[in-house]
Regions:
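Solvent-exposed edge beta-strands and adjacent loop segments
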Residues: 1-77, 116-130
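A generic structural motif
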Residues: 14, 101-105, 140
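Short secondary-structure boundary segments
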Residues: 18-19, 81-92, 147, 152-161
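Short, surface-exposed beta-strand/loop "edge" segments at domain boundaries and coil↔beta transitions
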Residues: 19-20, 79-81, 105-113, 145-147
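Beta-strand secondary-structure signal
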Residues: 69-73, 99-101, 134-138
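Short, acidic/charged, Gly/Pro-enriched secondary-structure junctions
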Residues: 83-111
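Mixed-charge, glycine-accented linear interaction segment located at domain edges/termini
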Residues: 110-163
């Protein structure tokens, strides 16, 4: 039993509808295994606002909300189809809004849910890795709750259980 939700992960995708992730399990599709160590969720601190008076003393302070970006690389393998939402990209822009789940191989650790995101993809090629599709999902404020949520992967996924 792990303590951290690190290491190899399973990624799932679904279309986001009206700012929410679908509740039906059949609407979620597992993505191909990403390139090793390419999956990461990055948090960017919000812009701070500080009111200062003459002399530099702080009168008030208001922190801005964080923003989140999920990134991962998928190999373009011979004989394997890329997910259809990736193939619909026009010059790198994937139409629609998307939801993502990140689950550790060890289901005793917390899983991550992004209910609403916009996506872009970038193709690259190297002799080391072949053709890679770099996926960048910029998380948007969902219909309810926090932009990034955590849930218990041991039980069947239910968006309403995400906190």
């Amino acid at each position: 039993m792990a303590v951290l939700n690190w290491g190899e992960c399973n990624l799932f995708h679904a279309d986001s509808t009206a700012g929410a992730a679908p509740k039906e399990a059949e609407k979620w599709k597992e993505l191909p295994t990403p390139k090793e160590e390419s999956t990461q969720l990055t948090t960017e601190a919000g812009s701070d606002k500080t009111a200062t008076e003459e002399g530099g003393a702080i009168v008030d302070y208001m922190p801005g909300k964080n923003t989140y970006t999920l990134e991962f690389d998928l190999f373009k393998k011979a004989g394997e189809e890329l997910p259809d939402w990736i193939t619909k990209a026009v010059d790198g822009v994937v139409p629609g809004e998307h939801a993502f789940r990140i689950e550790s191989q060890d289901k005793s650790t917390a899983a991550i849910l992004i209910e609403r995101a916009v996506v872009r993809v970038e193709d690259s090629y190297s002799t080391t890795d072949g053709t890679l599709i770099h996926v960048t999902a910029k998380a948007l404020k969902p219909k309810e709750g926090n932009t990034v949520k955590y849930y218990d992967a041991k039980t069947k996924f239910q968006p309403s259980e995400a906190a």
